[in-house]
Amino acid sequence: MDSIEIVGGKKLKGIIPISGAKNAALPLMIAALLTEETLSLDNIPHLADIELLIRILNNHGVGYAVDGQKNHTECVHSRTIHFTAQKITTTYAPYDLVRKMRASFWVIGPLLARCREAYVSLPGGCAIGTRPVDFILEGLKTLGARITIENGYVHAKVPKGLKGAHYRFPKVTVGGTHVMIMAAVTANGKTVLENAACEPEVTNLVQALNAMGAKITGEGTTILTIEGVQKLNGARISVIPDRIEAGTYAMAVAMTGGDVMLKNANPHHLTQVLEILQKTGLDIEIKPQGIHLKRNLRQTKIMPVDIKTGPYPAFPTDLQAQFMALMTRAQGISHITETIFENRFMHVQELNRLGAQIKLDGQTATVFGTEHLQGAPVMATDLRASVSLVIAALAAKGKTTVNRVYHLDRGFERLEEKLARCGATIQRITV
């Protein structure tokens, strides 16, 4: 099992290219199930979750080509993948595939829309909370689906096809919004979704579906109106830059000091994050090619800032762990409140192993900033927690070994290579 070794204390200097957003690529790939024609997606990152979803889609009969070449067995190393679901060969999504990634459950929407039936295992993924699929299932019922759950599988049927309806999400859910949009685009009649997620990744999906012939209005807002169409066409869409990756590297620069350009990062997707990082003392300049970051830790100390996670455009839960790592070296006390997931502080114990001083009280972590962190062996517990340990290790004295980095490979493309090119002492160890 791979691990990553880091010797801290080096400033970061250079250019970090920001990859396509995994959280945007996954629903776009699943949308290929909605059309017989080819959906071409540019800027897809090379990640374990992408590879897994390719296998899942292939299980349903979706062919794919990388820059015009078929590849049914290996993870791709290219920016463009062409997906063609000319015929859905099965509506069955088995446990051995779906259990590895929660987003794979989203195939239930397109399968119901196109085949009027889906038999999908309940999902897996990072163990950071229950993330119930109840909102998705209740929403699909509103569109006319008959749903039963048996032996860990959801069996959904709609013999006469889905019908437009009005549905209000009890709580903002990105995954639920993705599924309901994809289910409703070819439903008979009008669907109105209230309290919908308005993350940039949702907007990316809406724009893609409209390019395929859907009729969706309200993009970027919490109310989406969908006029069902009979069929969707193929299209070519670019995956948006990964705002979570960009925010992660911005926090790394804030932690170590240095001078880094985040190439292709979209600052409009990170408005609150950048404002908060400026309050910590990071110098940020928006340029045509991306986001330019500077920090001289001898001149500007890391200032403590309180944050509370929330649905977009609030501070993203996917950057909470990374920001906590930054706050471990702040000149004072900060408070971090998590409102999205109920179990997303598993990184606290590992950060404390590096010398951090963090105390938990329910959904709030109090971080007592310390001048120095000390390298030590630590264990990644989930995707975002794992990268928070990397950020802390970059500033810690001595060597840190981050174990179970397969979590990192699910969401960060060539992380150690990007950091090493900016001067970090970091390497992957394969046992």
From Swiss-Prot:
UniProt entry tagged with the keyword Kinase: no
Name of the protein this chain belongs to: UDP-N-acetylglucosamine 1-carboxyvinyltransferase
NCBIfam families: murA (TIGR01072), PRK09369.1 (NF006873)
One MF annotation (Gene Ontology) recorded for this entry: UDP-N-acetylglucosamine 1-carboxyvinyltransferase activity
Catalytic residue list: 126
Gene giving rise to this polypeptide: murA
Enzyme class of the recorded protein, top EC level: transferase
SUPFAM superfamilies given in the database record: EPT/RTPC-like (SSF55205)
Location(s), subcellular: Cytoplasm
Gene Ontology CC annotations of this record: cytoplasm
Similarity field: Belongs to the EPSP synthase family. MurA subfamily.
Protein residues bound to phosphoenolpyruvate: 22-23
EC number: 2.5.1.7
Function: Cell wall formation. Adds enolpyruvyl to UDP-N-acetylglucosamine.
Keywords in alphabetical order: Cell cycle, Cell division, Cell shape, Cell wall biogenesis/degradation, Cytoplasm, Peptidoglycan synthesis, Pyruvate, Transferase
SS bonds (residue pairs): none
Pathway(s) it belongs to: Cell wall biogenesis; peptidoglycan biosynthesis
Residues involved in UDP-N-acetyl-alpha-D-glucosamine binding: 102, 318, 340
Organism field: Bartonella henselae (strain ATCC 49882 / DSM 28221 / CCUG 30454 / Houston 1)
GO biological process, one term: UDP-N-acetylgalactosamine biosynthetic process
Listed Pfam families: EPSP_synthase (PF00275)
Modified residues (2-(S-cysteinyl)pyruvic acid O-phosphothioketal): 126
Catalytic activity: phosphoenolpyruvate + UDP-N-acetyl-alpha-D-glucosamine = UDP-N-acetyl-3-O-(1-carboxyvinyl)-alpha-D-glucosamine + phosphate
Domain of life of the source: Bacteria
